[in-house]
Curated annotation (Swiss-Prot):
Similarity annotation: Belongs to the bacterial ribosomal protein bL12 family.
Database matches in SUPFAM superfamilies: ClpS-like, Ribosomal protein L7/12, oligomerisation (N-terminal) domain
GO biological process terms on file: translation
Pfam families: Ribosomal_L12, Ribosomal_L12_N
Organism whose genome encodes this protein: Lachnospira eligens (strain ATCC 27750 / DSM 3376 / VPI C15-48 / C15-B4) (Eubacterium eligens)
Annotated keywords: Ribonucleoprotein, Ribosomal protein
Identification of the protein by name: Large ribosomal subunit protein bL12
Assembly, per entry: Homodimer. Part of the ribosomal stalk of the 50S ribosomal subunit. Forms a multimeric L10(L12)X complex, where L10 forms an elongated spine to which 2 to 4 L12 dimers bind in a sequential fashion. Binds GTP-bound translation factors.
Described function: Forms part of the ribosomal stalk which helps the ribosome interact with GTP-bound translation factors. Is thus essential for accurate translation.
GO molecular function: mRNA binding; structural constituent of ribosome
Gene (name only): rplL
A GO CC term assigned to this protein in UniProt: cytosolic large ribosomal subunit
Length: 121
């Protein structure tokens, strides 16, 4: 199997399947994917004085119109129905990581229009 074929297979995986793949790779090779995140977080401290350009969009509360919120979460994330429902039921959950300011504001607006409470971090 070529590198390109592996990439194509990975592109077809859901978020939950990707999470399982990362965990399996960590166990198989005795590494941690979190190590890179720690390094990135250390560098982010210096950039904190500058204006923040990337945001995590957190679904804080689903509100009364849960079905509509699930539909919007599916639209934003590309998740299947069950995965999107799990995200909404498990609120507070991050629905989009490292979104640009404009994208984060747009996602927040869409979710708030259907009654959800959203926090940008």
């Amino acid at each position: 199997m070529t590198t390109q074929e592996i990439i194509e297979v990975i592109k077809g995986l859901s978020v939950l399947e990707l999470n399982d793949l990362v965990k399996a790779c960590e166990e198989e090779f005795g590494v941690s994917a979190a190590a890179g995140v720690v390094v990135a977080a250390a560098g982010a401290g210096a950039a904190a004085a500058e204006e923040k350009t990337e945001f995590d969009v957190e679904l804080t509360e689903a509100g009364d119109q849960k079905v509509k919120v699930i539909k919007v979460v599916r639209e934003i994330t590309g998740l299947g129905l069950k995965e999107a429902k799990d995200v909404v039921d498990g609120a507070p959950k991050v629905v989009k990581e490292q979104a640009s300011k404009e994208e984060a504001e747009e996602i927040k607006k869409k979710l708030e229009e259907v009654g959800a409470k959203v926090t940008l971090k």
